[in-house]
Structures are given as C-alpha cells and as structure tokens.
C-alpha cells in the first residue's frame, strides 16, 4: 500500500522520484480519455476531448504533475499537434484561394470573425474576463490550437498560466460539437433541401466545387476547325486546363487508343477528356457534343492503374520532365494529392506521396511504375529531418515579436502559430527545393494524436483544481449558453449567405461550415448524409485558413484586451 501511495502521490522515493508518478498519471489520463472517446451518443462522440475531462477529474483530486514538467509537456504536445496539421494542409493551402476556393474561404472567414465579434460583445456586456471568453470561444468552435495559442499568449503577457481559459474551453466544447451538427441539420430544413437534386448537382461539381475537383467527360469531335489538327496545337486554342486520355477514331476501328501530343483529331472521333467541371462546358462546346462511351470495354489491352510517387529524385519534378508518354507510351490522366484530384497538366510539379493515374498497356504501365517507385516500404520510412528542422524554425519564428498599433505588447506567433506557419511553408514549397516533406497518413496521425493527447491531458490536469468551484459558485454554467450563441449564430448567418448570396450546393456548404469550426464530428455527420465528396472537399478547402485564423485571433484577443 505504501508503494502505491508513493507512486500515485509522487513522493520522491521508491520509483525514482516524480518521473514514475508523472508517467503513470499522464498515461492513465490519456488511456481513460481515449476509451471514453469511443462512446457515442446518437452517433456523436467527443473523441479525444474526453482526455481533457479525465484530466480535470484527476486534477480535482490532486493527482497532478510537477508544475514545470506539466508546462513542458503541454507546450511540446501542442507543437507536435499543430506541426502535423501544417504538414497535412500545407500542400493545398495556397491553391485553396484560387477561383471557387476563394469564395469558400470568404465564407469561412465570416464564421470566424462573426464568432470573434460575438465574443467581444459578450465580454463587454457581461464583464466576463477576456481570458475566459477566449476559452469559451475556442471550445464553442472546437478548436484546440486556439486554446493553446491563447494560453501561450497569456503566459507571455502575464508570466503565469490562466486556468480559466481551459475551464471556459471545457465547459463550451461538448455543446460546441452538438450545436454545430444541429445547425447543419437545421439549415437543411430551413432551406427545404431536395437531397436527391443537391446530390446530383454535387456529383457534377455544381455549387463551387467546379474548380476544386476533376471529372472525365466523353466527347464527339464536331468542330470542323479541329479536323487534322494535333493535340499540342489545340491546347492553346482552348485556353483551358485539360487532358485527352483516350481516343477512338472514326475509321472503322472499334478499339480505343492512347493519345499523345502529336495525335491528330478528325471529325467524328470520340475522345475522353479529364478537366475541372467549370471548364467542361467550354471544352464541350469547343470540341463538339457529349456522348456515352464505355471506354473500358473498347480496348481490353489498355488498363488504368494508380501509382504512388515514392522515389525521392522525382520530388519537385514536373510531368513534362518525366516524359511518360514519349518513353513508355502511357498517359498520366490525373494526380491525387492529399485526397484531391488534380488535372495532370505538363507543368504540374509532383511530390512524394502523390498518386498518379496512368493509362496504357500492361507493359507500358509496368515500366512507368518502375520509374515512379510505387514502393510503400520506401514511403513508410519516416523523413525526420524536415520535422525536427521545421519545429526548430517554428520555435524561432514563434519567438519573434511583432508590433501592431493599438496593442501595448508585441505580438508573437508563439509555439502554436510559429510551427504551424513553418510546417505549411515547408510542406508547400519544400518539394521545389528537393526537400522531402512527405509523411504517411498513419505517421502524421500518430504524431498528431500523441501531441493532442499530451496537450489535453496537461491542460485538464492544470485546470482540474478549480473546475467544480467555478461551475457551481462562480456562474460557470452560464458559459454554456454563451458558448452555444458563439457556435450557432455565425453558422446560421454564414449558412444563409452561402446559400442565397454565393449559391452554394448544400453539401458543399455544410462541409465549409464544418471546416470553419474545425469540427471533425460535424464532417463525419456531413459525410454520412451523402455518397458524394462535396462535404469533404469543402471542409479541406477552408480548414487550413480557418485553423490559421483561429490561432491568430485567439492570440490577438488576449494581447489586446488581456
């Protein structure tokens, strides 16, 4: 009994002092939290956030860690978490602002800044400290990096931790998840959505998915001006990004053929074109008319295969440099990066981990496969240099002070913002400088989950001491209502703007709204409503900017009003 008492209370004996005690407490908090996160009520789970609540319970009963160790593990966990997020979202961060992505990100910004305005209004009306209100804001929008950024900013400003930030987050978080899902469901009935029609339009890329996905379309050549022209001569005339994957000539042949830049078109030829939905209408009008063709049945010798880019020397090279068509007689028709299909244009730079779709004969595709790699074993080997180099650079960037007018203290990006920005930049521009930034999804997820688990456990342990007293005696239960207001009002406002001003497809809209609250349970709910990828594409398009703004605004609120 004495041994167990010493172990749990952390007395400096028997098990090597406080180390065994700290590891035990931290491990139990994380393990119990993850187990509780498996529980679903009405199909909704709080996931790893249960770690925070278990930590609060442990902290309430004084099962805690050394103060300095607690602070270190919390910050280190936060760094791992935000850095892994940056690696994931970085490749698509800047491209998300192009064309339709710009509109979706504008809508997400409305959600973010509406929440900030409501938070400020409640702060001035009720007199609740801004530290508490920022915690409520982060919980209401289920944004853990925002919580970390707020705590970091407050620590830089005052030199001490503010447990009320974590308390506000913990109180608002559960209904932040539920409130977001209920808002998405409410919009469905308010807009009287015809689900079949919306899903059909989403499948065609209508409703601001036109620039964010690619689709195949079969066309018959009817434009007399194209008769006898080569593909490479036609591309500048169309002024659209597209790939002609296959062709069947009107010369009695029943089989389809691959296309290269010197292939000539003739009236009546049937072609398979890969392009973004917004370009398909113009491309169709230019070539002729859409038709239905079963391409797989026309030539059994042609196969289509997805191949992974796993050779480091290909990192940053363009498709034109690889000369797949000239060397092997196969065609690259599309490139999948981070779950999004891209048009395989000659200028597209490849990255480690890209999945390219190649069409050709079995022999040609096999030769191309050897050149590209397609070795999961090679991808599974972690590239640790960019991770730790990026974390080091992120810590340096996060420590640089920036002066803003009206803010008495210099603003620092901190240990949340610095590593996030560096990881986005490295993952986006690293391949151009031959820096391998790819990590497998499982490895990235492992880093992220370890980071968020450490962070939430430490936040809960630190906030547990005064949690019950705050809720019962200091009016903490009212924070729940404030959190619901911050959750629901911006979503409904943005929902109406997105539907009636931006004419968004419903499934795209709910994906954007889920992404603007960085809410994975809401995305899971949205995906369950439809078989199309519109919610996931909408979520992924706005997630990077939203995450960045949540971190930045949380810091600015603390530094300007703290």
Swiss-Prot record:
Report the locations given in the UniProt record. Cell membrane
Q: Which residues form the RCK C-terminal domain?
A: 204-286, 289-374
Membrane-crossing ranges are 15-34, 41-63, 78-97, 104-126, 165-187, 384-403, 413-430, 450-472, 476-498, 505-524, 539-561
Q: Name one Pfam family in it.
A: Asp-Al_Ex
Query: Which GO cellular component terms are attached?
Result: plasma membrane
Molecular function (GO) terms listed? monoatomic cation transmembrane transporter activity
Superkingdom of the source species: Bacteria
Question: How the protein sits in the membrane?
Answer: Multi-pass membrane protein
The record's keywords, sorted A to Z, are: Cell membrane, Membrane, Repeat, Transmembrane, Transmembrane helix, Transport
Any single biological process term in GO: potassium ion transport
- Principal localization reads membrane
Q: Which family does it belong to?
A: Belongs to the AAE transporter (TC 2.A.81) family.
- Tell me what this protein is called: Uncharacterized transporter BF2507
Give the organism the record lists. Answer: Bacteroides fragilis (strain YCH46)
């Amino acid at each position: 009994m004495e041994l167990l008492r010493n172990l749990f209370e952390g007395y400096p004996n028997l098990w090597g002092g406080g180390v065994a005690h700290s590891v035990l407490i931290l491990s139990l908090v994380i393990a119990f939290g993850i187990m509780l996160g498996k529980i679903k009520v009405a199909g909704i789970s709080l996931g790893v956030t249960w770690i925070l609540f278990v930590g609060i319970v442990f902290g309430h009963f004084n099962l805690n860690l050394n103060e300095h160790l607690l602070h270190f593990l919390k910050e280190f966990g936060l760094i791992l978490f935000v850095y892994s997020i940056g690696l994931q979202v970085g490749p698509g961060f800047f491209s998300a602002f192009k064309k339709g992505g710009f509109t979706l990100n504008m809508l997400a910004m409305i959600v973010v800044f509406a929440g900030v305005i409501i938070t400020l209004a409640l702060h001035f009306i009720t007199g609740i400290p801004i530290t508490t209100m920022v915690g409520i804001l982060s919980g209401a929008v289920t944004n853990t990096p925002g919580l970390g950024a707020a705590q970091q900013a407050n620590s830089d400003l005052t030199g001490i931790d503010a447990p009320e930030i974590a308390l506000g987050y913990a109180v608002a978080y559960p209904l932040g998840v539920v409130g977001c899902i209920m808002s998405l469901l409410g919009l469905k009935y308010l807009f009287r959505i015809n689900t079949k029609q919306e899903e059909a339009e989403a499948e065609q890329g209508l409703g601001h998915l036109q620039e964010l996905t690619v689709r195949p379309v079969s066309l018959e050549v009817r434009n007399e001006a194209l008769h006898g022209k080569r593909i490479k001569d036609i591309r500048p005339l169309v002024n659209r990004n597209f790939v002609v994957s296959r062709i069947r000539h009107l010369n009695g042949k029943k089989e389809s053929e691959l296309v290269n830049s010197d292939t000539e078109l003739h009236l009546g030829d049937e072609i398979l074109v890969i392009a973004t939905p917004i370009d398909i209408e113009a491309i169709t009008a230019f070539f002729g008319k859409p038709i239905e063709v079963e391409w797989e049945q026309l030539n059994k010798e042609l196969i289509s295969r997805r191949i992974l880019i796993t050779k480091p020397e290909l990192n940053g090279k363009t498709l034109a440099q690889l000369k797949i068509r000239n060397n092997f007689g196969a065609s690259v028709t599309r490139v999948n990066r981070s779950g999004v299909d891209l048009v395989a244009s000659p200028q597209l730079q490849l990255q480690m981990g890209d999945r390219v779709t190649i069409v050709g004969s079995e022999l040609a595709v096999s030769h191309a496969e050897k050149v590209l790699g397609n070795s999961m074993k090679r991808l599974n080997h972690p590239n640790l240099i960019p991770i730790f180099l990026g974390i080091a650079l992120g810590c340096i960037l996060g420590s640089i002070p920036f002066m803003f007018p009206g803010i008495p203290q210099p603003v620092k990006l901190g240990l949340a913002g610095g590593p996030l920005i560096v990881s986005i930049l490295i993952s986006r521009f690293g391949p151009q400088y031959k820096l391998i930034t790819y990590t497998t999804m499982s490895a990235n997820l492992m880093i992220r989950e370890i980071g968020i688990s450490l962070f939430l456990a430490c936040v809960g342990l630190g906030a547990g001491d005064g949690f019950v007293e705050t809720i019962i005696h200091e009016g903490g239960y009212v924070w729940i209502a404030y959190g619901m207001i911050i959750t629901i009002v911006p979503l409904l406002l943005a929902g109406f703007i997105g539907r009636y001003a931006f004419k968004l497809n419903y499934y795209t809209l709910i994906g954007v709204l889920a992404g603007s609250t960085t809410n994975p349970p809401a995305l899971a709910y949205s995906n369950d409503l439809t078989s199309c990828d519109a919610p996931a594409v909408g979520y992924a398009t706005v997630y990077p900017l939203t995450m960045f703004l949540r971190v930045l605004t949380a810091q600015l609120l603390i530094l300007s009003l703290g």
